Amino acid sequence: MMARVRLAAALIPATAILSCLRTESWDPCVQVVPNISYQCMELNLYKIPDNIPISTKMLDLSFNYLRHLGSHNFSSFPELQVLDLSRCEIKIIEDDTFQGLNHLSTLILTGNPIQSLAWGAFSGLSSLQKLVAVETNLVSLNDFPIGHLKTLKELNVAHNFIHSFKLPEYFSNLPNLEHLDLSNNKIQNIYYEDVKVLHQMPLLNLSLDLSLNPLDFIEPGTFKEIKLNGLTLRSNFNSSHVMKTCIQGLAGLKINRLVLGEFKNERKLKGFDRSILEGLCNLTIEQFRIAYLDEFSGDDTDLFNCLENVSVISLLSVSLGSLQALLKDFRWQHLEIINCDFDKFPALKLSSLKKFVFTDNKDISSFTEFQLPSLQYLDLRRNHLSFKGCCSHADFGTTNLKHLDLSFNDVITLGSNFMGLEKLEHLDFQHSTLKQINAFSVFLSLRNLRYLDISYTNVRIVFHGIFTGLVSLKTLKMAGNTFQDNLLPDIFTELTNLTVLDLSKCQLEQVAQTAFHSLSSLQVLNMSHNKLLSLDTFLYEPLHLLRILDCSFNRIMDSKEQDLQNLPRNLTWLNLTQNAFACVCEHQRFLQWVKDQRQLLVGAEQMMCAEPLDMKDMPVLSFRNATCQMSKMIISVSVVTVLLVSVVGVLVYKFYFHLMLLAGCKKYGRGESTYGAFVIYSSQDEDWVRNELVKNLEEGVPPFQLCLHYRDFIPGVAIAANIIQEGFHKSRKVIVVVSQHFIQSRWCIFEYEIAQTWQFLSSRAGIIFIVLQKLEKSLLRQQVELYRLLSRNTYLEWEDSVLGRHVFWRRLRKALLAGKPQSPEGTADAETNPQEATTST
């Protein structure tokens, strides 16, 4: 039975939530929970849709036009547990309408103008626990056929036309009834006969709500010896006299909770005399609540004398002329003062008080010390209070305090380290302004503290020992504060038992790698609304028991280059929504991980790309790996192409003149040479070339036409082009005049390198080396290739003597004639016995 109640209680709020989160079309209704819950509200239905599954447990048909409910109208839904028929203009309910609904626990008929309700209308409801018949034109409980509903716990018939409080005899068949709501009916008088059934069959757990009934009279002795769990009388009386008389009529009642007063928007009493409550001396009350009463007249010193022995007293929006009524040492254990017009904080001295709630009293700004030696629970929320030197046992007059709530107040200066308050288990400062929290380890003595909330307290955390001493802490909430350099340091060293940590809205940009190393018991971590740029899984690896991680509303683009499997194994809920994801191939691994972890990620469908622009506001799940494969291929081909072009370009640039030479060889390869030799020399040696080389070769027999740059190069053409086209291509031989100046000239070396290529490409080409002067080997070795050639090949060496000259010119002419085609006239003066060339050593 209890299981059905729990299911109904869970399904009712679930409808509102899930209808927003998981709704899908189930024409014409909305499927809230597949095969379980369906919402058919405001669809202008005249009958129940045929396509609702037989397994449905919760069905909302409110605001339709069903009008007439016939026999076995809902027999197609034997599993139904909650049925809402609010405002369906139902006028007739026949016998056995709900027959077959053996599991139905909640039935709501609110707002139906019922004209005909058959005696067997509710037959078959063997498990019904809650029946709501608000605004159903009910005029008497005698006409309501519910006597057989033995499992009924809650009956709500408020806002009807019931004139009599007489409880029918069938109430003796409702042993489980716990709540009867008769508020806002037409009940004026209550007589002994009306509650006779309660004398015969006590309903000890029954709570009655008679608010907003125009009560004029309660017969004395009506409730004598009756025990009730609760009675609510709010906005019932037109005058203080009527209220006083009716309270006196309650004499003899034993009640757990009595509520008197008015509603905020339903005020009837113009004044309140302290004598009104004198009748309470004849009642046995455990808990008393009085609400929305003001303009007390007379001295209120004895106002609560008849409530001296109650355990719980609650004052809601009560305007007391002075505080004298609260200054006596009553036996109260629980006192609530909510939104009352006090000018200053009450100086209480209640030796038995264990729980004190003093909230929403906006006119009080200063705190007054009080003496409450038994106090364990203190709630001072929303009072605009300021504290200087908070907190110690001297402030509250007790060393037994376990719960302290100072949230939503003004400035609280922590000048003490909670001396004498070592038993504290719950401490809440949220939305108050904390000062001096970084001065020292203010929580050092709170080794029993389980819950700490310093959210939105304008704290900038600098001191790393701020949480020293909190070895038993389970929950820490510190949202809305800031850290030095926007870095979360290692400040949780001693919090080894922490299970819940809230760091949201702390403007965090970085987290120290060891920040969470001590939190081996952590199960819930909220890092939302910060400025984190990446999902660093290594941070959370030590959190072996972590189940819930919220990183939403950050600036996360991707995960760091880590193994995403480092996330704790127990993690079942990860929120990464509202981040700046970069849906690019560079982060392909992370994006694929998002797709693979849809069950772990909350709202994975709502994870949107922030860049690139063509994917902005597109779902992360829409990213395709194939795009990256194509991109990789394109990039690879492009890179290879660029490399090849670059290499070719470099080679062409480096060997440009060699290529020109090659092209020229093909062009001039078969033609006659214009020159016998192209002379390569240093400008420093030009006198020797003109006076010796040119004179002896061009004027000698046979004559040899030489190609000289100063004479034969074409003006306006690049030097390199002249060297190749006029020098090498039109000459049979190349004469290289080697000297110290030659070796030091870059142009000479360049011409020499081209000459080597020319010799390689042309089969008839030849290079004749003339060493003009003795060369130092150290200088010659600077040109490795030239040194190697002179070491391995013959060359001519100039000697300025008669014999040396004769031998030099004879050998040079012979070298120039080698490979030259024979003319018809022959070469009569060609040498026939050339002397061997010398070889350098």
Swiss-Prot record:
| Membrane topology (Extracellular) | 24-632
According to its UniProt record, how is this protein modified after translation? Answer: Phosphorylated on tyrosine residues by LYN after binding lipopolysaccharide. Ubiquitinated by RNF128 via 'Lys-28'-linked polyubiquitin chains, leading to proteasomal degradation.
Q: List the disulfide bonds.
A: C29-C40, C281-C306, C390-C391, C583-C609, C585-C628
Q: Which UniProt keywords apply?
A: Cell membrane, Cell projection, Disulfide bond, Endosome, Glycoprotein, Immunity, Inflammatory response, Innate immunity, Leucine-rich repeat, Membrane, NAD, Receptor, Repeat, Signal, Transmembrane, Transmembrane helix, Ubl conjugation
- The leader peptide range reads 1-23
Record-linked Pfam families: LRR_4 (PF12799), LRR_6 (PF13516), LRR_8 (PF13855), TIR (PF01582)
Q: Which GO terms describe its cellular component?
A: early endosome; lipopolysaccharide receptor complex; plasma membrane; ruffle
Where is composition skewed (Polar residues) in this entry?
Answer: 830-841
All residue ranges annotated as the TIR domain in the record:
673-816
Q: Mind telling me which InterPro entries this protein's record contains?
A: Cys-rich_flank_reg_C, Leu-rich_rpt, Leu-rich_rpt_4, Leu-rich_rpt_typical-subtyp, LRR_dom_sf, TIR_dom, Toll-like_receptor, Toll_tir_struct_dom_sf
Localization of this protein: Cell membrane; Early endosome; Cell projection, Ruffle
LRRCT domain boundaries: 579-630
The record's principal subcellular location, in a coarse class, is membrane
Mark the transmembrane ranges: 633-653
Please give the residues the UniProt entry marks as glycosylated.
N35, N73, N205, N238, N282, N309, N497, N526, N570, N575, N625
What is the membrane topology noted in the UniProt record heading this document? Answer: Single-pass type I membrane protein
Task: Output one GO BP term.
Answer: positive regulation of interleukin-1 beta production
A GO term, aspect molecular function: transmembrane signaling receptor activity
Positions in the Cytoplasmic compartment? 654-841
Q: Which family does it belong to?
A: Belongs to the Toll-like receptor family.
Q: Could you tell me what this protein does? A: Transmembrane receptor that functions as a pattern recognition receptor recognizing pathogen- and damage-associated molecular patterns (PAMPs and DAMPs) to induce innate immune responses via downstream signaling pathways. At the plasma membrane, cooperates with LY96 to mediate the innate immune response to bacterial lipopolysaccharide (LPS). Also involved in LPS-independent inflammatory responses triggered by free fatty acids, such as palmitate, and Ni(2+). Mechanistically, acts via MYD88, TIRAP and TRAF6, leading to NF-kappa-B activation, cytokine secretion and the inflammatory response.
Show the domain comment: The TIR domain mediates interaction with NOX4.
Subunit details:
Belongs to the lipopolysaccharide (LPS) receptor, a multi-protein complex containing at least CD14, LY96 and TLR4. Binding to bacterial LPS leads to homodimerization. Interacts with LY96 via the extracellular domain. Interacts with MYD88 and TIRAP via their respective TIR domains. Interacts with TICAM2. Interacts with NOX4. Interacts with CNPY3 and HSP90B1; this interaction is required for proper folding in the endoplasmic reticulum. Interacts with MAP3K21; this interaction leads to negative regulation of TLR4 signaling.
The protein's name is Toll-like receptor 4
Q: Specify the species.
A: Boselaphus tragocamelus (Nilgai)
Its taxonomic placement starts with: Eukaryota, Metazoa, Chordata, Craniata, Vertebrata
